[in-house]
């Protein structure tokens, strides 16, 4: 089985593939201070609880946290010594031409999402990844990464508002009764849900105007369900898009 690890700034998502099928998945907090042994114990524990502790034949990983990535390398070598490790970084085969001023600036997760989106849905496409930041990644009709938009994420925006406005507090993210809030909590919820939905629709519309044909719009990321029902431009919700991309990149780099 293939273990895939997507390390984000806030959360780490792990998945287990048997062939093309995602058979299990977990979401844990990202902690850059977590050592290789702590990470190994954590993963072994998750696999053991799912009765899948043995049979890992490969590991594929992408990360936006360099310190955590170093520990993954050590963990994989110690805890899964017979399983080849593929880390998405410059020099790895992805099959994705990166049409960016400096390709090394592009986050590994964005390349992974581009590959998965094009493989599953074709192009042109726009991937909207709701994470610590909200990323809009643009895929050409030939599977090229064209660039995109990086915007503050939902949680970051909520935290900033609560910390900078003395009379506002952090609220539970939920759809309010109406876009016209009748109290402070509902007004904040309306701003979050409808504000971010409008951001998605507005940016997607502007990007689509720059493309030669209508793109398929794919939403992914842990915070997507917060606003997805209010987005008018999203065609597909795929919460495991990044995990699928990690599987595809592993297959491109490790022969069967």
From Swiss-Prot:
Q: Which Pfam families match?
A: Pan_kinase
- Tell me the pathway: Cofactor biosynthesis; coenzyme A biosynthesis; CoA from (R)-pantothenate: step 1/5
* The protein's Enzyme Commission number: 2.7.1.33
Uppermost EC category: transferase
- Catalytic residue list: 109
Copy out the cofactor comment.
A monovalent cation. Ammonium or potassium.
Tell me the residue numbers annotated for binding K(+): 129
BP term (GO), one? coenzyme A biosynthetic process
Q: What cofactor(s) does the depicted protein rely on?
A: NH4(+); K(+)
Q: Quote the record's binding site residues for ATP.
A: 6-13, 132
Q: Which UniProt keywords apply?
A: ATP-binding, Coenzyme A biosynthesis, Cytoplasm, Kinase, Metal-binding, Nucleotide-binding, Potassium, Transferase
Provide the binding site for substrate.
Answer: 100, 107-110, 184
**So what does this thing catalyse?**
(R)-pantothenate + ATP = (R)-4'-phosphopantothenate + ADP + H(+)
Return the GO cellular component terms, semicolon-separated: cytoplasm
Query: Entry's InterPro entries?
Result: ATPase_NBD, Type_III_PanK
Q: Which GO terms describe its molecular function?
A: ATP binding; metal ion binding; pantothenate kinase activity
- Enumerate the subcellular locations listed in this protein's record, separating them with semicolons: Cytoplasm
Which HAMAP family does the annotation name? Pantothen_kinase_3
Give the protein family. Answer: Belongs to the type III pantothenate kinase family.
Question: Quaternary arrangement and interactors, per the entry?
Answer: Homodimer.
Function of the molecule: Catalyzes the phosphorylation of pantothenate (Pan), the first step in CoA biosynthesis.
| Name this polypeptide is given | Type III pantothenate kinase
The organism named in the record is Acidothermus cellulolyticus (strain ATCC 43068 / DSM 8971 / 11B)
């Amino acid at each position: 089985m293939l273990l895939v690890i997507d390390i984000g700034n806030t959360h780490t998502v792990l998945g287990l593939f048997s062939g093309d099928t995602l058979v299990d998945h977990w979401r844990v907090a990202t902690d850059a201070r977590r050592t290789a042994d702590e990470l190994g114990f954590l993963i072994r524990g998750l696999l053991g609880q799912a009765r899948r502790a043995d049979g890992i034949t490969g590991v594929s990983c992408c990360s936006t946290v360099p310190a955590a990535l170093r520990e993954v390398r050590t963990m994989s070598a110690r805890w899964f010594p017979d399983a080849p490790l593929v880390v998405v970084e410059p020099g790895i085969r992805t099959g994705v031409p990166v049409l960016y001023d400096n390709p090394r600036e592009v986050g590994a997760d964005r390349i992974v999402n581009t590959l998965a989106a094009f493989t599953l849905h074709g192009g042109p496409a726009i991937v909207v990844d709701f994470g610590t930041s909200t990323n809009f990644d643009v895929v050409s009709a030939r599977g090229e990464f064209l660039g995109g938009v990086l915007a503050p994420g939902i949680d970051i925006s909520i935290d900033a508002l609560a910390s900078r406005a003395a009379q506002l507090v952090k609220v539970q993210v939920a759809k309010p009764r109406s876009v016209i809030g009748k109290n402070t909590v509902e007004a904040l919820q309306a701003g979050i849900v409808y504000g971010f939905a409008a951001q998605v629709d507005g940016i997607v519309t502007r990007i689509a105007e720059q493309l030669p044909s209508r793109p398929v719009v794919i939403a992914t990321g842990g915070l997507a369900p917060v606003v997805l029902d209010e987005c008018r431009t999203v065609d597909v919700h795929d919460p495991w898009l990044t995990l699928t991309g990690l599987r595809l990149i592993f297959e491109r780099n490790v022969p069967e």
